[in-house]
């Protein structure tokens, strides 16, 4: 099919006419995109079947990765690259007058995630397939994703994400493998032959229908599967209002992260989580039973990984299957469960560690609650035996306490491995946040520093840079990213530096064009592109960035002797629809942009840009063009971060706190090649535990801080005097929870160092190349090898 450009072009034209019922000249770009996508899917079908057979018959284990998010982005170009046929396709299409780039832009980003959690899951799937490892994803097929972000008068407005409006060429619906998921109802117990038996009756059934997406490895022939579950009405429903039932059923897979500020939203989120877990475990068990009569050896052949706490119900659901369907004893079922399930923790933020009110949980999932109660009872008894009389410890460690079910505790107790995602994050978990659990299960905790799919974020996103790297050190880095370290000597090579700078200039011009087309702002491509793109949250401190821009604006206006190297500040972020404070930060960014971009006294030196509806395909345009990577979260709050790695891999220099993977980047590149500032994690934690921080002191003693804080409420933004009162209050009356004012001066100093260093372009480029050379460690290939060896016990398929 892809053996030559001529053969491909001929088959493409025939397939287009056959499937679309149109002549080539009458076909639309969408027709051409679907034709190409279907050809790729057909091309890999034999490998997909073979991989599934290998996974099933493999003498070792296979892994199932359960995640509420999978932020895939666009798949067509990545698949063409992984199959090694992109050049043939591009040349063949050119022969018949089609520009491949135009076809690629037709594809919608898959609306299956929000931020780092989902993108990490997608990177892991890429590495699993590219390393020939038997690993598959399990998620939900959200009809409308998170939301499509629109900016109206500086305010975020959420619209349904229409990513499926033209269908999805990659998915295969497997209705014959649908399973039923029960909600509500009652559990009845009967005793038979001295054992209790449980029946879940009068439940409301939702049918979970799987849609499978192929995950194609890079030049391996391995095609793993991402299975996404779609919620559909039960065919034999005989309850009340059928229309109401249909709406409630379809809502389960309609949106990612429905608003949970009210009970209805909490119930829907909990439904989603059990829907994912129940459907996935039934599918896993059904697949396992094809080659095994009993589930007694499940843990020897299957590893189930839960990505954050959303799939933590895998613990009681696997117990339910083993107890109620296999009639195992509690002890045997528990042994299998805690040798099958592993858990990644992604946060130290207490509000992000899910807790479900029992008064909602118990009626919705009655059998799950019964099993969790028993797990909790047995666990608390074990803690008592180890720490007799220590009621406080038991209270702190209990899975159910104070009217809630603590999902992180459930995940820890029911897993054989608990890992953090950066060294400092794992240390904080062990020494502080989960100290009691670590003392009880010292061998259960470990670290696996996150990684990114370098073939997407460098090879695909930045082909120009990839080409000059390959010219310098060969192409081994594509499959062995650690070999990028061989690039380090080229950091002082004048010819390589010139090539690097030329490519960077080209990518910056392309981003400048995109900014003008999407935001209507003219930016100077020769300016410093200073970029902060990530989920909007107070701890990520987009506010610190904005307040510093306001300070620069003030100084440029007031001090005629002050000047800076032109700097363009670029933001991209979505705020949760119910996160009022985060949405106010978005509005503030736009108000500052309005002030700065149209002031003739400063607009040649500063520009502020907010890119609407930030997503994976946009990120692929942003990272290669960036000079400065903003990784400025409050120390101890960012578990790892992966944006820092994507920027690093494309030669941007990090300005960052001593947090997450920033610390590990610093360890590799050295202090000259990164700009660190601010409080360290232990200092932040000390303030939080012992007090002593008073933000008003910084407000009173630093004129810069006082001026920008006052401007939030004194009419500086015309017609918006009350708009940012909540932000002002967060900094002063509420004492600045995330230490924005405390770190302001240190951050401003780091920005001054950036200003000075960027003027020495050769030295700046040297530091950029050093970053690229050390970025191979942060490939998800390395991360997945560690998971495979240390946690899952899986080996490459032969």
From Swiss-Prot:
Pfam family, one: Phosphorylase
Cofactor: pyridoxal 5'-phosphate
CDD domains: GT35_Glycogen_Phosphorylase (cd04300)
Swiss-Prot/TrEMBL GO biological process terms: glycogen catabolic process
Induction note: Expressed exclusively on media containing carbon sources that allow efficient sporulation.
Major enzyme class: transferase
Signal peptide boundaries: none
Source organism superkingdom: Bacteria
Family to which the UniProt record says this protein belongs: Belongs to the glycogen phosphorylase family.
This protein's name: Glycogen phosphorylase
Species assigned in the record: Bacillus subtilis (strain 168)
Gene for this chain: glgP
């Amino acid at each position: 099919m892809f053996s030559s450009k001529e053969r491909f072009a001929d088959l493409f034209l025939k397939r287009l006419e056959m499937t679309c019922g149109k002549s080539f000249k009458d076909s639309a770009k969408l027709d051409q995109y679907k034709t190409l996508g279907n050809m790729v899917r057909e091309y890999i079908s034999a490998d997909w079947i073979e991989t599934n057979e290998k996974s099933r018959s493999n003498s070792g284990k296979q892994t199932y990765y359960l995640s509420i998010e999978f932020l895939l982005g666009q798949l067509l170009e990545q698949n063409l690259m992984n199959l090694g046929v992109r050049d043939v396709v591009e040349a063949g299409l050119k022969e018949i007058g089609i520009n491949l780039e135009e076809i690629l832009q037709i594809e919608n980003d898959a609306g299956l995630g929000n931020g780092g959690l989902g993108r990490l899951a997608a990177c892991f799937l890429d590495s699993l397939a590219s390393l020939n490892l038997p690993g598959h994803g399990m998620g939900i097929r959200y009809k409308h994703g998170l939301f499509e972000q629109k900016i109206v008068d500086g305010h975020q407005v959420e619209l349904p994400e229409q990513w499926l409006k033209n269908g999805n060429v990659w998915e295969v619906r497997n209705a014959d493998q649908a399973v039923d998921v029960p909600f509500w109802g009652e559990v009845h117990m009967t005793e038979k032959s001295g054992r209790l038996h449980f029946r879940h009756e009068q439940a409301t059934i939702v049918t979970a229908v799987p849609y499978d997406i192929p995950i194609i490895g890079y030049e391996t022939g391995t095609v793993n599967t991402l299975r996404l579950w779609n919620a559909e009405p039960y065919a034999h429903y005989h309850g009340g209002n059928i229309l109401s039932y249909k709406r409630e059923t379809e809502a389960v897979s309609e949106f990612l992260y429905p608003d949970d500020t009210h009970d209805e939203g909490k119930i829907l989120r909990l439904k989603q989580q059990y829907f994912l877990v129940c459907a996935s475990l039934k599918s896993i068990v059904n697949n396992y039973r094809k080659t095994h009569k009993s589930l007694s050896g499940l843990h020897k052949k299957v590893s189930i990984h839960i990505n954050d706490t959303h799939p933590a119900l895998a613990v009681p659901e696997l117990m339910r299957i083993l107890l109620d369907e296999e009639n195992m004893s509690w002890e045997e079922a528990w042994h299998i469960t805690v040798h099958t399930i592993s858990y990644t923790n992604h946060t130290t933020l207490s509000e992000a560690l899910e807790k479900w009110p029992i008064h909602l949980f118990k009626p919705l999932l009655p059998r799950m609650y019964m099993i969790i109660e028993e797990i909790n009872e047995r666990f608390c008894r074990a803690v008592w035996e180890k720490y007799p009389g220590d009621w406080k410890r038991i209270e702190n460690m209990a899975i159910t306490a104070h009217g809630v079910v603590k999902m992180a505790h459930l995940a820890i107790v029911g897993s054989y491995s608990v890992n953090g995602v950066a060294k400092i994050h794992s240390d904080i978990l062990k020494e502080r946040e989960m100290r009691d659990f670590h003392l009880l299960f010292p061998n259960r905790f470990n670290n696996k520093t996150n990684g990114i799919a370098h073939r997407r974020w460098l090879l695909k996103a930045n082909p120009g840079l990839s080409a000059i790297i390959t010219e310098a050190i060969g192409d081994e880095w594509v499959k062995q990213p650690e070999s990028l370290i061989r690039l380090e000597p080229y950091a002082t090579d004048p010819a390589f530096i010139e090539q690097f700078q030329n490519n960077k200039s080209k990518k910056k011009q392309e981003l400048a064009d995109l900014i003008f087309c999407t935001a209507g702002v003219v930016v100077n491509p020769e300016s410093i592109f200073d970029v902060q793109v990530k989920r909007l949250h107070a701890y990520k401190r987009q506010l610190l960035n904005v307040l510093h821009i306001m300070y620069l604006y003030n100084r440029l206006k007031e001090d005629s002797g002050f000047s800076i190297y032109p700097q363009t500040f670029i933001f991209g972020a979505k705020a949760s629809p119910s996160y009022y404070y985060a949405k106010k930060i978005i509005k503030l960014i736009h108000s500052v942009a309005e002030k700065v971009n149209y002031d003739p006294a400063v607009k040649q030196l500063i520009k502020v840009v907010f890119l609407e509806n930030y997503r994976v395909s946009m990120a692929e345009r942003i990272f290669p063009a960036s000079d400065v990577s903003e990784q400025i979260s409050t120390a101890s709050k960012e578990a790892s971060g992966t944006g820092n790695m994507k920027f690093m891999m494309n030669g941007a220099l990090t300005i960052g706190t001593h947090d997450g993977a920033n610390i590990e980047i610093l360890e590799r590149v050295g202090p000259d090649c990164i700009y660190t500032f601010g409080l360290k994690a232990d200092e932040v934690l000390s303030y939080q535990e012992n007090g002593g921080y008073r933000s008003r002191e910084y407000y009173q003693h630093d004129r810069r801080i006082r001026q920008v804080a006052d401007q939030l409420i004194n009419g500086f933004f015309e017609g918006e005097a009350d708009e940012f009162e909540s932000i002002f209050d967060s900094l002063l009356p509420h004492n600045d929870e995330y230490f924005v004012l405390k770190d302001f001066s240190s951050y401003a100093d780091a920005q001054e160092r950036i200003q000075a260093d960027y003027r020495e372009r050769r030295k700046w480029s040297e530091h950029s190349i050093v970053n690229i050379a050390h970025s191979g460690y942060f490939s998800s290939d390395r991360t997945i090898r560690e998971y495979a060896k240390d946690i899952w016990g899986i080996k490459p398929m032969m």
